[in-house]
Amino acid sequence: MIHITLPDGSQRAFPGPVTVAEVAASIGPGLAKAALAGKIGDQLLDTSHRITADCRLSIITDKDDAGLELIRHSTAHLLAYAVKELFPEAQVTIGPVIDNGFYYDFAYQRPFTPDDLVAMEKRMAELAAKDEPVLRRVLPRDAAIAYFKGLGEHYKAEIIAGIPGDEEVSLYREGSFEDLCRGPHVPSTGKLKFFKLMKVAGAYWRGDHRNQMLQRVYGTAWASKEALQQYLTMLEEAEKRDHRKLGRELDLFHIDEHSPGTVFWHPKGWTLWQEVEQYMRRVYRDNGYQEVKGPQILDQGLWEKTGHWDKYRENMFVTESEKRDYALKPMNCPGHIIIFKQGIKSYRDLPLRFGEFGQCHRNEPSGGLHGIMRVRAFTQDDGHIFCTAQQIQSEILAFTALVQKVYRDFGFTDIIYKLATRPEKHIGTEESWDQAEHALAQGLRASGCEFEYLPGEGAFYGPKVEYTLKDALGRQWQCGTIQVDPNMPERLDAEFVGEDGARHRPIMLHRAIVGSLERFIGILLEQHAGALPAWLAPVQLALLNITEAQSDYCREIAAKMQKALSHLGLRLLLDLRNEKITYKIREHSMQKLPYILVAGDKERAAGAVAVRARGHGDLGVMSVDAFIERIADEISTKA
């Protein structure tokens, strides 16, 4: 007898080997129809998998995250099936699952067109409607290589050639199409109903620019028609909020071919950048951080000691001077340790908190660059806390409270907390890992935060907490982090004198709140659809006259406001152009200014202004003093 234990603790007995599908059918016809896969331990299995021993089994459906990932993976194969039917000369390569969908790379003699995508999607729907079974078989490695070479699928043969010779290779067939894959897959193509192909882009084979350029077809797939439509609607809204589009429309920045992956900030954009930086500088000052500044270029020897030269060199910009090799820093941590090492440090100095707005450079592939979100030169709100193991928990508690306040001020209230724990290959004792992971968890619990564990996703030298924002469209952005690191202080020989008079290694906590300022500003623009709150807006209000007769009055009002709000650095635009008032109002409204003030003869006589507030329309006539009070409160409270 084989005993299967289900998630609710109940057991089912079978006289001999049984498939996942048969177990699902024994529970009920509804589950049998909905079953996409099974899960034993951490392993996902096809519904055709034969169970030969007692186990705990979960049936995976499209209600599970794993089920949705399975749908997307299988839809990628369905795309390849359709492409091979439409374009038999195309060669298939790889087709993984990505956030919200999948892609598949093809080698073909000409670029795919938008009409080709329409044809592919139509053929996919036809193949799905046939509800063909998805069947698995296993071949010896060399037989699999010969099989795919015989089909003319040389990329697949190359992939398999990289697998050890004594291993078997699994293949999945649906109809006339068979592909290399570890699996699992949905039991039949009829499970794949709600998908859409999104775009085609270029991608080098194996990500190497020296190899052939392939065509990458992107798609999305969901468990229901409603979920697919909701996602497509979100994409439409995201397109309207695209920070690259807003950067042009609001005259904030641009990216130029003369310096790929770096930002040309325009006056208004640089004002926004400085406002974010100055806010974070006040955060440093008010929370016990000492601001420091390290050099841009550091010697190769230092990067060899930290391990970056071996593991990260391809992503570093390297230069040479007087027969010495240097690299532009991709991160600030080594510089902070060098500063820490100047002079003897005592346990009384700890925790010691350094912060830096350090400009970093990373040689990102050109295909991965994206506006100001993914760049090669960026400024990091980088901080490092030197402390003892016993101080980790209190530092996590303080840092989490700080993260929450900063995100709230910028308009984010939904934060997801994740704790990444030790990977299988790690350094340090199990006791030190237990202590660090416990300190992070207790710090989060003391902050009142619900969090999820990310088993095995910590760095090889220490665990970390990730702080992920959820924006107005429900998208997630991982910005904040705090990482426990006993390794780099060891590598660079950082020490402090303990209470016992002996020398000890400090623990280093790498921490960032907004991360890259450039990326965070991109997130801010998309969160607020360009309509930044008054305290952040590059221009907070425009003051307009109706005719020349009110010009002097507008100048007087502007001077009064600037004087009254000098402590807040009011950013006011005085527009006295001889244009129709409707034209001027429309122009400034398109720039998403928080306030537009208009002064005509009536307002001048009353010593007042007509106020228009973004999102609220005409607020009527208001005294100048009343408006000063209103905007001062809005800026100072970050409303």
Swiss-Prot record:
Binding site for Zn(2+): 333, 384, 510
Broad class of the protein's primary localization: cytoplasm
InterPro entries hit by this protein: aa-tRNA-synt_IIb (IPR002314), aa-tRNA-synth_II (IPR006195), aa-tRNA-synth_II/BPL/LPL (IPR045864), Anticodon-bd (IPR004154), Anticodon-bd_dom_sf (IPR036621), Beta-grasp_dom_sf (IPR012675), TGS (IPR004095), TGS-like (IPR012676)
Keywords: Aminoacyl-tRNA synthetase, ATP-binding, Cytoplasm, Ligase, Metal-binding, Nucleotide-binding, Protein biosynthesis, RNA-binding, tRNA-binding, Zinc
Catalytic: region residues: 242-533
Domain of life: Bacteria
Family to which the UniProt record says this protein belongs: Belongs to the class-II aminoacyl-tRNA synthetase family.
This protein's name: Threonine--tRNA ligase
Originating organism: Verminephrobacter eiseniae (strain EF01-2)
